Amino acid sequence: MASDFLPVRRALLSVSDKTGLIDLARALVARNVELLSTGGTAKAIREAGLPVKDVAELTGFPEMMDGRVKTLHPLVHGGLLGRAGVDEAVMAEHGIVPIDLLVLNLYPFESVTVKADCTLADAVENIDIGGPAMLRSAAKNFARVAVATDPAQYADLLAELEVNDGQLSAAKRFALSVAAFNRVAQYDAAISNYLSAVADSSEAVPTRSPFPAQINSNFVKVMDLRYGENPHQSGAFYRDLYPVPGTLATFQQLQGKELSYNNLADADAAWECVRQFDAPACVIVKHANPCGVAVGAGCGDAYELAYATDPTSAFGGILAFNKTLDAATAKAILDRQFVEVLIAPDYEAGALEYATRKANVRVLKIPHGNGLNNYDTKRIGSGLLMQSADNRSMSLGELSVVTQRAPNEAELGDLLFAWRVAKYVKSNAIVYAKDSRTIGVGAGQMSRVVSAKIAALKAEEAKLTVAGSVMASDAFFPFRDGIDAAAAAGIKAVIQPGGSMRDGEVIAAADEHGIAMVFTGVRHFRH
């Protein structure tokens, strides 16, 4: 087994991203490390006044085919793969010199192919061949060789060389090896995903299928979780390699206990719901369902109205705001109720200071961003369900009035508010709302009319008046009984997708009760 610490005497540098290259090369030269390099990397090092030897000089074989072949040579791979204490004789016989450090990043395939005008030819030319081969050779031989794949690794690498008099530890070499294999896997996955989605290879800029023949996913571990969905289950949180700006995965935890699986699942539901509103809004979630949502003049006003919907369920809930959380609102929340997680795009200093008095409360900051997830996925037994994300919004102009009475301006505003909330309630979903606040929420029932009754019951428990409210349903009413129940509760307007074979009966029921009803033509099932 190789020594724990091994010196770096010779390094091969070949990078597409030249960030930090010259500083790294200069530091290595200062330690009398011999530099080998290729193409543009060698040119950059040479122009910085540093000594460097071209790989072509090492191999005696020129770069060819516009740089496609330059490092695919036994003198390169033998120098990376040669084992200490095993291969010295054969290396000496064939004139192979050991390479102790490989610094390499790959052709920018990912950044090139995300461009809308990327041609298939451009994509193919940015598939690196020699780079991944060298990374694999160096990473496999971590017992002797170190490999760096990212400029972010340079500082730590140089720091260890400084502390250990020009040597790298076995632990550092192994960690760098794992990172290199991960990078190669990510790179190959990106190539596979791109090519698998090409619908017609004869097109210069190919049409790409939204559901390719094969999917390769890459997620990076962020943290171990307190536990899974239940305490007897373990859990961890992984982030997409390229997270969408503004989504939950970009959060920063400012304080609080370890997060659990349920914390993050509920936080995602709360955050996705609240970020669809422009005015100050508060969403309170319990077991992945909004139990109170409101828009107000500020965070404090929105919180008071959302909390009033269902104070019982709000206990131990997840609270999300779409504006900077002020100190007064933070104090009002934490003095009143037990909170699992607070979420906001930012916090006033006073809000954070007050939160420290409740040290167990998890405080998450999610930077503003308008990005939307393009897909939703769900694991089933030995399989994956994949669909385009439900990012469909609704405007007033898209609503179809189907009853004799049209909703008035105030009702229209409340209908759109309730519709936005219903999208994030588990099916069957019913939402009662008035004045841009929820009055009652019925979630997750097998019968739609039962969900409507639960929404009314919740309003009664909270001592809120349903009369004059509007109702949103995530899917059509199969029978008129849902409208009859709404009328009995005092509902004045309804928003629903429509599309039932009994729409005529449902519309007639609304007309009988003087209820205004609009169809969206869009369903929002959520399971």
Curated annotation (Swiss-Prot):
State its Enzyme Commission number(s): 2.1.2.3, 3.5.4.10
Task: Name the pathway it acts in.
Answer: Purine metabolism; IMP biosynthesis via de novo pathway; 5-formamido-1-(5-phospho-D-ribosyl)imidazole-4-carboxamide from 5-amino-1-(5-phospho-D-ribosyl)imidazole-4-carboxamide (10-formyl THF route): step 1/1; Purine metabolism; IMP biosynthesis via de novo pathway; IMP from 5-formamido-1-(5-phospho-D-ribosyl)imidazole-4-carboxamide: step 1/1
Pfam families from the UniProt entry:
AICARFT_IMPCHas, MGS
From the UniProt record, list the reaction(s) this protein catalyses: (6R)-10-formyltetrahydrofolate + 5-amino-1-(5-phospho-beta-D-ribosyl)imidazole-4-carboxamide = 5-formamido-1-(5-phospho-D-ribosyl)imidazole-4-carboxamide + (6S)-5,6,7,8-tetrahydrofolate; IMP + H2O = 5-formamido-1-(5-phospho-D-ribosyl)imidazole-4-carboxamide
This protein's species is: Xanthomonas euvesicatoria pv. vesicatoria (strain 85-10) (Xanthomonas campestris pv. vesicatoria)
Matching InterPro entries: AICAR_Tfase_dup_dom_sf, Cytidine_deaminase-like, MGS-like_dom, MGS-like_dom_sf, PurH-like
Query: Which residues belong to any copy of the MGS-like domain?
Result: 1-149
Residue ranges spanning the membrane: these are none
Membership in a protein family: Belongs to the PurH family.
Protein name per UniProt = Bifunctional purine biosynthesis protein PurH
Give a yes or no for keyword Metal-binding in this entry. Answer: no
Q: Which HAMAP family match?
A: PurH
Instruction: Show the domain comment.
Output: The IMP cyclohydrolase activity resides in the N-terminal region.
Does the keyword Transmembrane feature in the UniProt annotation?
no
Keyword list (alphabetical) reads:
Hydrolase, Multifunctional enzyme, Purine biosynthesis, Transferase
Query: Which terms does the record give in the GO molecular function aspect?
Result: IMP cyclohydrolase activity; phosphoribosylaminoimidazolecarboxamide formyltransferase activity
